[in-house]
A protein has these predicted regions:
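N-terminal small/polar loop signature for handling phosphorylated ligands or for N-terminal nucleophile
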Residues: 36, 40, 48-112, 200-259
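Phosphate-binding and adjacent anionic-ligand microenvironments
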Residues: 245, 283-460
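Short glycine-centered, acidic/aromatic-flanked micro-motifs in structured strand/loop junctions
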Residues: 52-53, 187-189, 260, 341, ...
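An N-terminal, well-structured beta->alpha segment
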Residues: 1-68, 72-73, 152-185
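Proline/glycine-rich low-complexity loops and linkers
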Residues: 131-165, 169, 260-333, 337-338
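Gly/Ser/Thr-enriched, mixed-charge loops and adjacent short helices
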Residues: 13, 113-241
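Short beta-strand-to-turn element immediately C-terminal to the catalytic PLP-Schiff-base lysine
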Residues: 117-120, 257-261, 338-340
Length: 460
């Protein structure tokens, strides 16, 4: 089955059977549930929703299905077209809209698409609201508008530019200093909407852009998740072009990775580390990441004399914790930068601007910058379970075994050792337990993972 319904939206593969894949009927049903929930929540006579999409091949089809379903409910739709996840998040409050829908399956391959749901702040809907929307969809509890009360459709293609203006206006972004450096940068946007947004931002900052896979046609030239094994082309190109560094974004531009001037991975985990280092050097405040993110961020927070706290995995959880501790920057170790000065959402445009500001101020190469940060190495693994095995029982047994260590149970089980940690999480969509480890060397991280895999398998 390739249809996953969750509190943050619905995602699946295009084609196939209803309720097994993301078919037109599933898209309509879920859009109707969201629209019905919004109407009930707002209590307003006229409800407005912003819709934007990445460049996936199925994007236009899904967009038409979703927007005309909302219009059928009597909801006005602002179609901002080819866009990015953070751009839609910024557009919702600018439009004074009641919600937003982002049509993207993020880093999933081209056959996938999804509806991601926003509230009137341009933030992902809460757990409670997501459950209410799922219930409406399950019960087909929709009431469509009569012919005289259908919604209206408007198109507005200016929001990427408006988003860029907001990024450039941030007090910690220093366009003049960046322009003086005359950086040369290679951009891999995996032929999605980052190919529109990132070069446009860089050009405004006086950066010479070398485009690689920047045609927003939805034909991804490699696996779109920005991991080392997928990024051989840009690593090679950075060296060939003698570029200062490379920028990689996923299809909806909420994840950001850098390539050093030597053609090596800066490390997705270190995107947030570098941006936080810059921000904390200018303003003191707390920082937040998720439990599976590198300890390097905690080290940077300590260096600047501020507090670090960890949230459960997932953007909604990180944002909730950031608000609780009034963090000035946060995110996830997969290259997601959340900078509340602009909005509470992962935003690669903000990340690029802060990173360039850091480079302009510090001088030196990107490779030298990376080497200035604490060195940690991660290992990511999983163990397969049968349907009969209860993952919660395994995690409970491991918690009891390591009760003498520092443990956290807000999201699975995380065990912190002196120079390493392990995070065990059950999947909500398949019968597996994920094992994340981090240590001072790759060998130690792999060995720690292997040890925990063996210990859990002994319990099965």
């Amino acid at each position: 089955m390739s249809l996953i319904k969750s509190i943050s939206g619905i995602r699946g593969t295009i084609g196939g059977k209803v309720d097994e894949n993301l078919t037109p009927i599933d898209a309509v049903k879920f859009a109707a549930a969201y629209g019905s929930w919004l109407k009930g929540q707002s209590g307003k006579e006229h409800v407005k929703v912003v819709i934007g999409r990445d460049a996936r091949i199925s994007g236009e089809m899904i967009q038409n299905l979703v927007q005309y379903t909302l219009i059928g409910l009597g909801i006005d739709v602002v179609n901002i077209g080819l866009s990015t996840t953070p751009t839609v998040e910024v557009a919702v409050p600018m439009e004074k809209a009641d919600g937003g829908i982002i049509l993207t399956a993020s880093h999933n391959p081209k056959e996938w698409n999804a509806l991601k749901l926003l509230n009137n702040k341009g933030e992902f809907v809460s757990d409670q609201d997501g459950k209410a929307i799922l219930k409406i969809a399950q019960e087909n509890d929709f009431s469509f508008a009569t012919v005289d009360h259908l919604g209206k459709l408007t198109h507005d293609n200016q929001y990427i530019d408006l988003h860029i203006e907001k990024v450039l206006a941030l007090p910690l972004v220093v366009p003049e200093a960046i322009q003086k450096k005359k950086f040369r940068v290679v951009v891999d946007a995996v032929n999605s909407t980052g190919g529109i947004a990132i070069p446009r931002l860089l050009e405004r900052l006086g950066v010479e852009v070398i485009k690689l896979y920047c045609e927003p046609n939805g034909h991804f030239p490699h696996n779109p998740e920005p991991l080392k094994e997928h990024l051989g082309d840009i690593c090679k190109r950075v060296v060939e072009e003698k570029a200062d560094f490379g920028i990689v974004v996923d299809p909806d531009v909420d994840r950001l990775a850098f390539i050093t001037n030597k053609g090596e991975m800066f490390g997705e985990e270190y995107t947030l580390v570098a941006c936080a280092d810059y921000v904390l050097g200018k303003a003191k405040g707390n920082v937040v990441s998720n439990l599976s993110s590198s300890r390097a961020l905690r080290d940077i927070a300590q260096k600047h004399g501020v507090s670090y706290s960890a949230a459960a995995v997932g953007e909604v959880n990180v944002v909730t914790e950031m608000k609780r501790v009034e963090a000035i920057i946060g995110g996830e170790g997969n290259g997601g930068i959340i900078y509340p000065e602009l909005h509470y959402g992962r935003d690669a445009l903000v990340g690029v601007a802060l990173f360039l500001s850091l480079l302009a101020e510090r001088g030196g190469s990107v490779q030298q910058l990376r080497e200035s940060y604490p060195a940690y190495f991660m290992s990511k693994n999983k163990i397969q379970l049968t349907e009969q095995i209860n993952p919660d029982q395994i995690l409970k047994a491991m918690e009891q075994k390591y009760a003498h260590e520092q443990t956290t149970t807000i999201d699975g089980l995380k065990i912190d050792f002196a120079d390493s940690w392990v995070h065990l999480r059950k999947s909500n969509t398949e019968p597996i337990i994920r094992i994340y480890t981090e240590a001072k060397s790759q060998k130690e991280a792999d060995a720690l993972a292997h040890r925990f895999i063996e210990e859990m398998q002994a319990l099965i």
